[in-house]
C-alpha cells in the first residue's frame, strides 16, 4: 500500500486497521491517527512489512485515549491479526485489577484468577495501561502498598503525606470515604466518567464554600486530569453483556455516510460502513432505511437489538421481517437516554468523521463533490474546474489592498494567487476597490498570463457583486459570478436565471436573488473554503504593508499617550485591529497604562473609525 492511497485521517484518537484481502493484518491505536499511521510508512522492520502487504486501511474515531485502548483490545482479540504477533495470546495481555480486600488497591497483572477481584482488560498496550494506573494512583487516594500490616505502622508513608492515600495502614482511612474512592475508580474503568466528574465538581464547590481552598485545588486538579484522559464517557462497551448493532449516519448534500458497529458480549468487535451518493433532498431516516435494507438482507447473524440514530417509517416492518428470519425477536429502536445513547453518539461521531474523510479524499483526487454541486446550484454549463476568489482588506483607510486566489479541481493553486494595491482612493470604498481589482485582472498583464476562470467568487454582498459585474462589462469579459455574504453565508446570484443567464446574453445584469444553502451542502463548503483563503490572503498582505511603521504613526496621534506607553502598546498589540477590538480592561492591563488612559485610547479609535466614509448598501 502506498502512502498516497491512504484515506484522509483525522488528528484525533482512534484505532486503525491495515487489511489485506479484507482481513486485518495489523491493528493499532493512536492519540493522533494521522501522525501515528504516517510513522508506519516511514519505519522499517515489521511496520515496513505490513504497510507493503496491506491493500486498504480503515480507522475508527474514539473520544479519547482510553476509549481507543479498549477498542484496540476488543478488535485484536476478535481478529487476531498476523502482525500483532506479541499480543495473540490473552495470557500476555495486561489487565488492571482492583483487589478484593477490605481496602482494595489497583495493580497491573497478566493473570486472571477467580479471587473475587474486579479485572479490567485485557489491554494490548502496556504503556497505556501504566499511564492510566499512574493517573489513578495520583488522583485517587487508594493504598499503594502490596499488603496491609497486621499491626499499625509506626508512621504514615509519603503517599499519605502527599494526600495520595487515605492511610488504611495506620487506621486513618474512613471506610465510607475509601469506599467512594473505590467506586470512582470502578466507574472510570467501566467507562462512566461523567458521574465521577460531576461528584468531584460538587465536592470542589463545597470545599471552596467552606474556605478549604487547598482541598478545592486538589479536587480541581483531579477533575482536570480525569477529563483529559477519560473525557466524559467511554462508549466502547456497556455495563451489561449484551449483543447488539448500533448505527450512526451523517449527510452533506448529495453525500452520506452510515456506519454500523457490532457489539458482542458488551464489547465492540467490528464495524461496517457505506458511503452513499444521491442523498440530496433525502432525510436521515430514508438514508438509514436504505442502509438497513442493503445490509441486513445479506447479514448472516442479526443480534436481538439494533439501535438507530433516527426513527424511520419502515423500522417496524424490518423488525418483523428480521424476527422471522432469526427465529426470535429482533427489535429496532432509537434510544432516548442511558448508555445506549452514548453508543449512538459514538457511531454518529464516526459517521461524521468518515464522511469528511471520504469527501476530502475525493477533493485530493481532483473530484471535489462541491464542483458538481456548484454546477447544479448555479446552473453552470459545466463543472467550475477553475475558481477565482476576490476580497478587499483595509483598516481606517490605510493601505487598501485586494487579494485573488485560484482553486483548480477544488484545490488551492498558491502559485497563481495575486495581490493588488488599490490605486487612487483616499478613503476605503469596498465597491470601487472590487471594481478596480476585477478590471485590472481582466485587462492588464494578467489577462494574457492566466486563463479565464469558470467561476468568480466575490467575498461580499450585493454591492460588491454588482461592482464586479460592472468591471466585467467594462472589460468585455463574460464570466459567471457568485457572491458569498458573511451574514448567514448567503449566496448572492446575478441574473434572472443565475450565472448562466449572463453567459448566454451578456446583457445588462445585476443581483437578482439570494440563496441560503444548508451549511453541510458541498457547494457551500467549496465556496467557504475559497472565501476563507482569499480573506486570509488579503488580510496578510494588508498587515505586511502596514507593518509597525503604520501602527506607530497611528499611535503617535493617541491623546495622553507618551513614548513609554506607545512602546508598551506596540509590544502588546501587534496590529491596530487587535487594539481596536480589545476591551478597555485589556488595554488598561498593559504595563504603564491606566483605566483612564485606556478609555481615552478606545474613544479616540472609535471616533477615528466613525469619521471615515464607508461603502453603503
UniProtKB/Swiss-Prot annotation:
GO CC terms, sorted: cytoplasm; excinuclease repair complex
Domain UVR: 194-229
SUPFAM superfamilies per UniProt: C-terminal UvrC-binding domain of UvrB, GIY-YIG endonuclease, RuvA domain 2-like
SS bond partners: none
Family, similarity comment: Belongs to the UvrC family.
Subunit and partners: Interacts with UvrB in an incision complex.
Protein name stated in the entry: UvrABC system protein C
Organism: Deinococcus radiodurans (strain ATCC 13939 / DSM 20539 / JCM 16871 / CCUG 27074 / LMG 4051 / NBRC 15346 / NCIMB 9279 / VKM B-1422 / R1)
Record gene name: uvrC
Amino acid at each position: 500500500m502506498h502512502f498516497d492511497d491512504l484515506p484522509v485521517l483525522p488528528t484525533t484518537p482512534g484505532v486503525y486497521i491495515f487489511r489485506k484481502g479484507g482481513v486485518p493484518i495489523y491493528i493499532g491505536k493512536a492519540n493522533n491517527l494521522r501522525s501515528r499511521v504516517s510513522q508506519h510508512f516511514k519505519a522499517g522492520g515489521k511496520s515496513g512489512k505490513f504497510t507493503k502487504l496491506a491493500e486498504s486501511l480503515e480507522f475508527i474515531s474514539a473520544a479519547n485515549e482510553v476509549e481507543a485502548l479498549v477498542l484496540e483490545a476488543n478488535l485484536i482479540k476478535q481478529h487476531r491479526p498476523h502482525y500483532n504477533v506479541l499480543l495473540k495470546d490473552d495470557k500476555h495481555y495486561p489487565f488492571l485489577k482492583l483487589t478484593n480486600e477490605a481496602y482494595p488497591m489497583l495493580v497491573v497483572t497478566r493473570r486472571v484468577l477467580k479471587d473475587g477481584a474486579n479485572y479490567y482488560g485485557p489491554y494490548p498496550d502496556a504503556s497505556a495501561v501504566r499511564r492510566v494506573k499512574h493517573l489513578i494512583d495520583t488522583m485517587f487516594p487508594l493504598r499503594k502498598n502490596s499488603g496491609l500490616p497486621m499491626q499499625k505502622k509506626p508512621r504514615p508513608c509519603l503517599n499519605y503525606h502527599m494526600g495520595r492515600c487515605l492511610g488504611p495502614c495506620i487506621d486513618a482511612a474512613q471506610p465510607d470515604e475509601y469506599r467512594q474512592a473505590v467506586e470512582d475508580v470502578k466507574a472510570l474503568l467501566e467507562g462512566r466518567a461523567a458521574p465521577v466528574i460531576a461528584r468531584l465538581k460538587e465536592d470542589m464547590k463545597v470545599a471552596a464554600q467552606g474556605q478549604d481552598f487547598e482541598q478545592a485545588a486538589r479536587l480541581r486538579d483531579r477533575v482536570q486530569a480525569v477529563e483529559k484522559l477519560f473525557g466524559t464517557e467511554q462508549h466502547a462497551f456497556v455495563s451489561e453483556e449484551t449483543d447488539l448493532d448500533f448505527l450512526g449516519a451523517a449527510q452533506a448534500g448529495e453525500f452520506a455516510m452510515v456506519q454500523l458497529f457490532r457489539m458482542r458480549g458488551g464489547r465492540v468487535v467490528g464495524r461496517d460502513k457505506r458511503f452513499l451518493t444521491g442523498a440530496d433532498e433525502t432525510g436521515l431516516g430514508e438514508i438509514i432505511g436504505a442502509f438497513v435494507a442493503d445490509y441486513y438482507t445479506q447479514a448472516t447473524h442479526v443480534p436481538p437489538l439494533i439501535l438507530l440514530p433516527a426513527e424511520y417509517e419502515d423500522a417496524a416492518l424490518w423488525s418483523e421481517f428480521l424476527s422471522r428470519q432469526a427465529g426470535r425477536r429482533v427489535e429496532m429502536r432509537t434510544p432516548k437516554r442511558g448508555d445506549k445513547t452514548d453508543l449512538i453518539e459514538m457511531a454518529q461521531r464516526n459517521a461524521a468523521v468518515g464522511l469528511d474523510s471520504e469527501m476530502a479524499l475525493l477533493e485530493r483526487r481532483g473530484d471535489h463533490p462541491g464542483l458538481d454541486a456548484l454546477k447544479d446550484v448555479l446552473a453552470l454549463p459545466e463543472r467550475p474546474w477553475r475558481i477565482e476568489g476576490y476580497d478587499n482588506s483595509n483598516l481606517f483607510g490605510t493601505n487598501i489592498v485586494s487579494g485573488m486566489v485560484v482553486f483548480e479541481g477544488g484545490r488551492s493553486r498558491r502559485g497563481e494567487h495575486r495581490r493588488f494595491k488599490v490605486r487612487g482612493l483616499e478613503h476605503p470604498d469596498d465597491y470601487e476597490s472590487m471594481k478596480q481589482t476585477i478590471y485590472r485582472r481582466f485587462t492588464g498583464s494578467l489577462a494574457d498570463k492566466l486563463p479565464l476562470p469558470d467561476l468568480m467568487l466575490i467575498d461580499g454582498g450585493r454591492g460588491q457583486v454588482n461592482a464586479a459585474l460592472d468591471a466585467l462589462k467594462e472589460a468585455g469579459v463574460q464570466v459567471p459570478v457568485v457572491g458569498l455574504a458573511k451574514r448567514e453565508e448567503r449566496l448572492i446570484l446575478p441574473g434572472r436565471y443565475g450565472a448562466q443567464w449572463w453567459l448566454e446574453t451578456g446583457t445588462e445584469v445585476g443581483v437578482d436573488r439570494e440563496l441560503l444553502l444548508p451549511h453541510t451542502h458541498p457547494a457551500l463548503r467549496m465556496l467557504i473554503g475559497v472565501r476563507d483563503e482569499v480573506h486570509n490572503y488579503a488580510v496578510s498582505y494588508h498587515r505586511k504593508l502596514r507593518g509597525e511603521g503604520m501602527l506607530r504613526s497611528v499611535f503617535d496621534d493617541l491623546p495622553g499617550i507618551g513614548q513609554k506607553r506607545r512602546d508598551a502598546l506596540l509590544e502588546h498589540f501587534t496590529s491596530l485591529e487587535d487594539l481596536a477590538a480589545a476591551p478597555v480592561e485589556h488595554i488598561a492591563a498593559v504595563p504603564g497604562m491606566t483605566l483612564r488612559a485606556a478609555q481615552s485610547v478606545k474613544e479616540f479609535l472609535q471616533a477615528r473609525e466613525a469619521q471615515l466614509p464607508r461603502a453603503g448598501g
